[in-house]
């Protein structure tokens, strides 16, 4: 704990601290072995099971599933993890406990930290009551119990009786699942019959709830002030003016407050840990203690596969949040669920901001305001969350569920009135209702199914001059970019062995079998790494676009780790266990995601050697203070040779702002050959880098001995029969599958099968968004190639997709994507008129049926649902001839497409050279099927 300060709120403390009545509450843990019975037919209450000694046994804390009780899975679920055993209904938990003699006359409280989700309690066969919360502890006042042995019976019912939405992450089968059990602390706590029920620490006062079980009014003193506590209890407001260090992300100072109650022979003391921080908004930014703050962080979807529920201990959350901080994050959004006390305690200590949400997602549930019983539960849940976790300085933002509908503004008003220590939002992904901040789908990069407003004329901006979220600047309050990312990548099947708990990765096993059946299982690691590295590039660009935006509230990444539900979304550079996949080190990630980041605005990534590279340097500074900077930059090739470099004028980067550093200019005429260059910008103790590609300005010439063809027709086949070398450009607009499925749900999908005349998938630079089960899209995951292959001698590349491939592989038609997503026709028509149709720059030809060890030169990584062998560039012998196939349009507008010209030149030189020596001869039937079309036969 940082800077502990104990503030003792009574003038007579020196006397009170030695009075036994004022000792901290006595606690007895009930963790351990409990008697148990399942009640699938709901007979227990009528059968008085609370008076029956239950026959089975389980260990608590835990769940039915952890203890092996429930219906064992017969068939694996396809679109998510599979619970080994599953149970929905009532389950009975029972144990004996002893009340010590020293507790005689005491009030005893039962705490069940987290139940899933309704609990009913009996003591010695007598009903105590019922509690119903997914977010806060269930607390039962047992009154005074006689010393000696007693029997406690708890019935937990996880039946879906309150329609909060089956997609809500507090219960959804796509994440933790609707488990039955009791986790966290399970304990008895003894107090005097007059006690401190709760203390809330506000900026200038304390709100103290006092309980009184004596049945009559009691005179008491709290903080030296007298009050009368009526039977039942009272809430009192007490003055509070601490003189202590404030809490923030850079200096998370925590303090302890002792509140002491004296009521005659009764008394109590409650110790509260708190942090002093003032959260607000100004100029469309969040402020913490008056300083602008940018929220940067992932979404926690409650994916904890070993237990099926979130960790309840502080050490586990220290690990999770320390990992997040190592990647430069300072914020976490809990998607339609609330974390436990241990998470807040860890965040307080580490200086981390939480966005908590009520358990609501109305996708398949009534809108708020349409279901009175459910609405009462949600209102009560809001109150419970604010009381249980309100003192935590990490608890900064509160949203009313995820992407829900209804009169949610009522909840915002209620939250503001009850607890102004945090900021409130109606729900996520919407800007139409009342809120202290907005969330919107504005993105750094436009993908095939992301937001509608981020598209530029080119389809995306890769480190571009657009800030990436500029459309949010009209909002009157801070705006958070909602669920940025969701770029799919290929799974690494070695992770399957890590699923040893209540949830198993049978979905991954199915994908692995499919890949093996296609003869490509040996490529699993390559697919995972190439698609993963590509995804990291996209995350970098999105994050930087958000950081360039000013003023702005921040961004939430969906997700830093994989989400093995909702159709199976492999989207993280971490796996579902928060373990690194080895795609990027935290130190490298922090170069573009941290409080202070060097940034660059540049109009494009591909240049010719007769151009001058120009860019605008900036720095985003949300550090603790203004930062003197002396910017320096270098432009170097892959060998480290400096092409150009220089310094920019020294300046001071104000905290809470994006500051311009100056313009960078570098003539590229000294770059004689095709090259990838790296621009590195250093400023204020930080550095960041970006790749650009520089190509010769000349048009490629066709070398002798190579025939260029555009159809696999009789002329082409005759040339091959004569032993000629042919570079065939297959029309990327022909032979395509029709992508026409609609959303069927995470456990249903209509996959594409080979049909006559449909032998390729539409090419796209961007990878799949989330997954194919939920969104209509081509679904491919980037490319895989061998950079050392001689076909790339004149076209430098990595093994994975990078920005120089963007123009070659093609981009989704914005208008068509919008139509598929259900956007208004007028909106789509306008976008189509403005931008035109930029699809069909390439296609991915289906090469199923080729030998297992046959590999295309440019292999398109297919979605793990389909696992087709796909190629955009491949080669084969055809009798005595040699055929090189390129399914990319490298000719259209070639004068303005340097990458297209350069790739064509590289392929021509390869086809003319000695190293063009295809090792396979693909069947003529296959070539005719994938390379000929009805109008060419």
Residue spans of the language-model regions?
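Beta-strand-rich binding/interaction modules
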Residues: 123, 205-230, 236, 612-651, ...
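Aromatic-rich peripheral "rim/lid" segments of glycoside hydrolase catalytic domains that contact
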Residues: 418, 558-622
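Catalytic beta-strand/loop cores that center a nucleophilic Ser/Cys/Thr
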Residues: 735, 770-898, 916-937
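Substrate-binding/catalytic cleft of secreted carbohydrate-active enzymes
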Residues: 321-322, 331-574
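Short alpha-beta junction capping motif
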Residues: 704-769, 880, 886, 907-910
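Active-site-adjacent substrate/metal-binding segments within catalytic domains
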Residues: 67-99, 103-123, 129-130, 193-200, ...
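Accessory beta-strand-rich segments of carbohydrate-active enzymes
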Residues: 37-40, 83, 88-195, 213, ...
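Accessory carbohydrate-binding/adhesion or oligomerization-edge regions at the termini
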Residues: 23-77, 155-160, 907, 927-937
């Amino acid at each position: 704990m940082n800077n502990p300060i104990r503030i003792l709120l009574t003038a007579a403390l020196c006397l009170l601290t030695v009075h036994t009545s004022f000792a901290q509450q006595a606690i007895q843990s009930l963790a351990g072995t409990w008697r148990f019975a399942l009640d699938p037919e709901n007979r227990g209450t009528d059968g008085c099971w609370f008076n029956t000694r239950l026959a089975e046994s389980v260990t608590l804390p835990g769940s039915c599933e952890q203890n092996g009780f429930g219906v064992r899975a017969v068939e694996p679920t396809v679109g998510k993890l599979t619970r080994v055993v599953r149970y929905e209904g009532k389950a009975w938990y029972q144990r004996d406990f002893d009340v010590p003699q020293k507790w005689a006359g005491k009030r005893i409280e039962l705490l069940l930290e987290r139940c899933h989700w309704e609990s009913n309690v009996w003591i010695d066969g007598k009903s105590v009551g019922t509690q119903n919360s997914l977010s806060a502890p269930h607390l039962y006042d047992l009154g005074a119990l006689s010393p000696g042995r007693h029997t406690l019976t708890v019935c937990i019912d996880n039946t879906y009786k309150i329609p909060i939405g089956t997609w809500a992450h507090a219960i959804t089968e796509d994440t933790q699942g609707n488990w039955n059990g009791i986790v966290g602390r399970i304990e008895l706590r003894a107090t005097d019959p007059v006690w401190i029920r709760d203390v809330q620490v506000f900026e200038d006062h304390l709100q103290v709830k006092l309980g009184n079980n004596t049945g009559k009014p009691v005179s008491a003193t709290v903080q030296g002030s007298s009050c009368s506590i009526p039977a039942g209890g009272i809430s009192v407001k007490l003055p509070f003016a601490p003189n202590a260090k404030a809490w923030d992300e850079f200096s998370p100072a925590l303090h302890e407050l002792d509140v002491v109650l004296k009521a005659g022979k009764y008394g109590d003391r409650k110790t509260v840990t708190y942090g002093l921080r003032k959260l607000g908004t100004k100029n469309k930014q969040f402020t913490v203690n008056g300083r602008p703050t940018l929220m940067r962080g992932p979404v926690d979807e409650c994916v904890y596969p070993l237990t099926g529920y979130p960790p309840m201990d502080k050490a586990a959350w220290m690990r999770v949040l320390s990992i997040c901080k190592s990647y430069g994050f300072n914020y976490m959004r809990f998607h339609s669920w609330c974390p436990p006390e241990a998470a807040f305690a860890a965040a307080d200590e580490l200086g981390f901001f939480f966005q908590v949400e009520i358990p609501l997602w109305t996708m398949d549930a009534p809108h708020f305001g349409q279901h009175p019983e459910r609405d009462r539960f949600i209102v009560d849940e809001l109150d419970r969350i604010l009381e249980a976790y309100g003192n935590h300085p990490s608890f900064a933002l509160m949203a009313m569920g995820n992407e829900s509908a209804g009169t949610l503004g009522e909840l915002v008003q209620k939250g503001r009135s009850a607890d102004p220590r945090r900021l409130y939002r109606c729900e996520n992904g919407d800007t139409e209702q009342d809120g202290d901040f907005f969330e919107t789908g504005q993105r750094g990069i436009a993908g095939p199914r992301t937001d509608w407003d981020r598209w530029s004329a080119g389809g995306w901006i890769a480190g571009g001059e657009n800030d990436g979220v500029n459309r949010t600047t009209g909002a009157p309050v801070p705006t958070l970019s909602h669920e940025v990312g969701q770029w799919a990548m290929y799974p690494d099947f070695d992770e399957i062995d890590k699923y040893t708990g209540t949830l198993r990765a049978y979905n991954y096993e199915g994908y692995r079998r499919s890949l093996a059946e296609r003869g490509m299982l040996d490529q699993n690691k390559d697919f995972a790494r190439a698609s993963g590295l590509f995804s990291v590039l996209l995350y970098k660009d999105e994050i930087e676009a958000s950081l360039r935006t000013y003023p702005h509230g921040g961004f939430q990444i969906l997700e830093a780790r994989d989400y093995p539900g909702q159709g199976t979304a492999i989207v993280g550079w971490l796996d579902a266990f928060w373990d690194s996949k080895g795609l990027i080190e935290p130190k490298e990630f922090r170069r573009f995601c941290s409080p202070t980041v060097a940034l660059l605005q540049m109009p494009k990534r591909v240049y010719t050697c007769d151009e001058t590279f120009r860019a605008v340097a900036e720095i985003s500074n949300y550090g603790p203070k203004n930062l003197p900077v002396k910017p320096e930059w270098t432009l170097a090739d892959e060998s480290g040779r400096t092409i150009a470099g220089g310094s920019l004028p020294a300046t001071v980067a104000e905290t809470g702002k994006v500051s311009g550093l100056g313009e960078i200019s570098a003539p590229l005429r000294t770059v004689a050959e095709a090259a990838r260059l790296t621009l590195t910008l250093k400023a204020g103790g930080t550095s960041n880098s970006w790749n650009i590609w520089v190509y010769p300005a000349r048009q490629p010439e066709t070398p002798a001995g190579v025939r260029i063809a555009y159809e696999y027709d009789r002329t082409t086949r005759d040339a091959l029969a004569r032993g000629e070398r042919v570079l065939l450009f297959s029309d990327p607009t022909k032979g395509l599958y029709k992508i026409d499925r609609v959303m069927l749900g995470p456990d249903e999908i209509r996959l594409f099968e080979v049909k006559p005349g449909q032998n390729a998938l539409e090419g796209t630079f961007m990878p799949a968004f989330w997954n194919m089960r939920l969104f209509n899209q081509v679904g491919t995951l980037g490319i895989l190639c061998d950079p050392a292959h001689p076909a790339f001698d004149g076209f430098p590349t990595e093994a994975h997709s990078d920005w120089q491939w963007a123009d070659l592989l093609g981009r989704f038609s914005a208008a068509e994507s919008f139509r598929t997503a259900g956007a208004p026709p007028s909106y789509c028509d306008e976008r189509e008129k403005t931008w035109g149709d930029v699809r069909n720059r390439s296609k991915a030809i289906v090469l199923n049926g080729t030998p297992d060890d046959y590999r295309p030169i440019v292999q398109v990584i297919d979605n793990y649902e389909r696992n087709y062998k796909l190629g955009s560039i491949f080669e084969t012998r055809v009798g005595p001839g040699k055929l090189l196939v390129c399914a990319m349009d490298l000719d259209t507008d070639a004068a303005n497409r340097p990458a297209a010209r350069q790739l064509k030149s590289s392929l021509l030189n390869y086809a003319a050279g000695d190293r063009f020596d295809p090792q396979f001869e693909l069947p003529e039937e296959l070539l005719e099927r994938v390379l000929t079309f009805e109008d060419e036969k």
